[in-house]
Design a protein with these regions (language model features):
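Short periplasmic/luminal acceptor-recognition loop of GT-C membrane glycosyltransferases, typified by
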Residues: 49-89, 94-113, 476-533, 567-568, ...
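Divalent metal-coordination and catalytic microenvironments
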Residues: 52, 103, 171, 199, ...
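Di-metal (Zn2+ and/or Mg2+/Mn2+) metal-binding site signature of metallo-dependent hydrolases
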Residues: 192-217, 518-535, 594-606, 614-620
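Membrane-interface amphipathic/re-entrant loop segments adjacent to transmembrane helices
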Residues: 134-135, 139-143, 150, 189, ...
Length: 657
């Protein structure tokens, strides 16, 4: 294959470097998998006694004095090792602790989080079995920096109000533990969630504090100081992929300044990608890696376009030059958003239609927020500067409050966030990409814009027509008792079970999928507690008659059954019936349904053909003989076209043992 590729390359010189790069990348992936990953995965299925170190991503588990997160196994059954594993619950208080214990090693579950964990060097998961024995805490430098970061986080919490301290901690220290769900959702909906993830923008702004203008740009001691500051910040934040990429690019640029060489963003970015891929061949599977590099490509394209426009406007009036300057930030935001769109769609994430506007409004506010945050940390460390500390905290709070207000205003705009159909959108983007290659090869790129615009209009029109009346049903929330959300034509019906956390998960899911608040919330709980549902209509089944029926959405029917403390809702979509229940229902005649969603128990009064569930080991599993079982760990569901097809999403068939 390599020989054929080389022969083909000789005839196509322009494609030599990309093809050779792809072949080298594939070869390195195979070598990395065989040499490093395969021996680790061979440990799966064993029960071992290990010495483990708690890594810095560990956070509180559901039980008291328990953590969950990544463990680094430094010794396995008396043999030295260096294996990172995922553990859902283990004894501990903070990162850096060491202990010995017995673990059961298993492979990572085959779900959408698998590649993300592998990109962080985690190839196994473990279950804690006991025999806990604490050891002396690790003295590795990364834990000293982690403790320093925690002290600075405590300082921000002490001086800034709730919500605002979480925003500053995320932007300055890459810590999202204090971010409210509502704040994260607002930034995500407005298309500026990248501001809450430390990246090249933040690193460049912070290191720019040591720039002192163009006069001192090539002053070598100052270059070394900027490089040291960048390296310290990399280590302080724990070196996530986006920060590592930005740090490598910045260090390469500083090396260029040191030797008086011109910078090249595209080459530096490629070099960073190669380094990250060499240390872990799965690194490109990380979402942050993909978004970061795609955004850089968009920024690079915008810079090239801006230079072309400036050259064309050299002999034009001052108004044309001013127009180019005004258009540059708009083009940068638009092309960066467009470059990251395929990644967002591939990961089934919502895209923002107000991202360009919101970026223009708030990105300039990030640098003052970072500068004020640093000033607050410095002043708070000096007792006699308490007055300056109070003033800095006040100014920073007002600044962050203004930033958050702008973000929420943008997020509240109509169609701020939309969820595009994954496969169809990726196909349309692939067609547009193929057209771009064809026009570039034919040297007719100027004709590409009208052709792409026409194809986009046709794709959007066809997509809207194809999605009309399609019903999407998903399980959202706690795995043992999830809610069921039905979306059709931008309207939603929520079958509610559980508590506040389930409702929060439903709201996050509906962002971008529904144009307004849910049209109907059906409360299936046996003992409904007081909760504030934001919905056009709320129906509590416990307060209804034994049986009621009504139309919902566009041409769907809803049958509601009530018996003592058990409730059942059956949604009719054409000839198919989807059931959601709470409690063990007893009816005179059984109800036959096509799909039963995540039951807590099985009742003889409900006879499903298929059961869709999210719990790993439900109690009713042994009683499900004769039913097809469909399991999905994260938001499984199905898509129905009334009177036509039913397609399962993120749900695999499970064989009954």
């Amino acid at each position: 294959m390599v020989c054929l590729a080389l022969l083909w390359i000789k005839r196509r010189r322009d494609s030599a470097i990309p093809v050779l790069g792809a072949l080298c990348g594939l070869a390195w992936f195979l070598v990395f998998t065989f040499v490093w990953v395969r021996p680790v995965k061979a440990l799966a299925g064993q029960t071992v006694t290990c010495t483990a170190v708690v890594e810095t991503d560990a956070d509180a588990s559901y039980s008291e004095s328990r953590l969950r997160g990544t463990l680094r196994l430094t010794e396995i059954d008396g043999r030295a090792a260096n294996v990172k594993v995922e553990c859902a619950s283990f004894p501990g208080e903070s990162a850096g602790e060491q202990f010995t214990a017995k673990f059961a090693l298993t492979e990572l579950p085959d779900n959408k989080y698998r590649l993300s964990r592998q990109s962080k060097g985690v190839y196994l998961q473990v279950e804690y079995l006991g025999s806990y024995h604490p050891l002396e805490a690790s003295r590795a430098p990364r834990f000293a920096l982690y403790r320093l970061r925690q002290r600075w986080l405590a300082t921000l919490r002490r001086w800034l109000p709730r919500q605002l301290d979480g925003i500053e901690a995320a932007m300055l220290l890459a810590d999202k533990s204090r971010l409210d769900d509502s704040v994260q959702q607002a930034f995500r909906t407005a298309g500026v969630s990248h501001l809450l993830a430390v990246s090249g923008l933040h690193l460049a702004l912070l290191c720019g504090l040591l720039g002192f203008g163009r006069k001192w740009k090539f002053y070598k001691p100052l270059i070394l100081l900027r490089a040291a500051a960048a390296l310290f910040y990399l280590l302080l934040t724990g070196m996530p992929v986006s920060v590592s990429r930005a740090g490598i690019v910045l260090l390469v640029a500083l090396v260029g300044d040191f030797f008086l060489l011109p910078p090249d963003l595209l080459t530096s970015t490629s070099f960073a990608a190669i380094l990250l891929g060499l240390q872990n061949a799965y690194a490109p599977c990380d979402l942050g890696f993909q978004l970061s590099f795609c955004a850089v490509l968009g920024v690079q394209a915008a810079a090239t376009l801006a230079r072309t426009e400036q050259r064309a406007a050299q002999d034009k009036p001052a108004a044309a030059k001013a127009l180019c300057q005004v258009a540059e930030p708009v083009q940068t935001a638009a092309l960066a958003s467009l470059a990251t769109l395929p990644v967002l769609v591939a990961h089934d994430m919502a895209a923002s239609l107000v991202g360009v506007l919101c970026n223009l409004l708030v990105v300039w506010m990030v640098q003052p927020a970072l500068q004020l945050g640093i000033l607050l940390l410095v002043c708070s460390a000096v007792p006699f500067l308490a007055a300056i500390t109070n003033l800095t905290a006040l100014v920073l709070s007002l600044w962050l409050k203004g930033l958050l207000w702008l973000v929420r205003c943008c997020a509240a705009l109509p169609f701020a966030s939309i969820c595009l159909p994954q496969r169809y959108t990726l196909f349309a983007l692939a067609v547009l990409g193929a057209l771009a290659v064809c026009f570039w090869h034919a040297r007719r790129l100027r004709l590409y814009l009208p052709a792409a615009a026409l194809c986009t209009v046709l794709a959007v029109g066809l997509g809207v027509w194809m999605q009309r009346d399609v019903v999407q049903i998903n399980l959202i929330g706690a795995s043992n008792n999830p809610c069921v959300v039905c979306v059709q034509n931008g309207q939603a019906v929520v079958f509610f079970r559980g508590g506040e956390s389930n409702w929060s998960a439903v709201q996050n899911y509906l962002a971008g999928r529904s144009r307004q608040e849910p049209a109907l919330v059906v409360d299936l709980r046996a003992k409904p507690t007081q909760m504030e549902f934001s919905a056009a209509e709320i129906v509590t089944v416990q307060e209804l008659a034994d049986f009621t029926t009504r139309p919902v959405l566009d041409g769907l029917t809803l049958d509601l059954y009530h018996n003592k403390s058990a409730n059942l809702a059956v949604l009719g979509v054409g000839e198919r019936h989807i059931a959601v229940g709470a409690g063990r229902l007893e009816l005179a005649e059984p109800v036959r349904v096509d799909v039963l969603c995540a039951p807590g128990t099985l009742s003889d009064s409900v006879r499903p053909d298929t059961i869709l569930y999210t719990a790993a080991a439900p109690r009713w599993l042994d009683d499900a003989a004769g039913c097809t079982l469909r399991y999905g760990e994260d938001t499984p569901g199905l898509t129905l076209r009334p009177g036509r097809s039913m397609i399962w999403e993120e749900a695999q068939t499970i064989a009954v043992q």
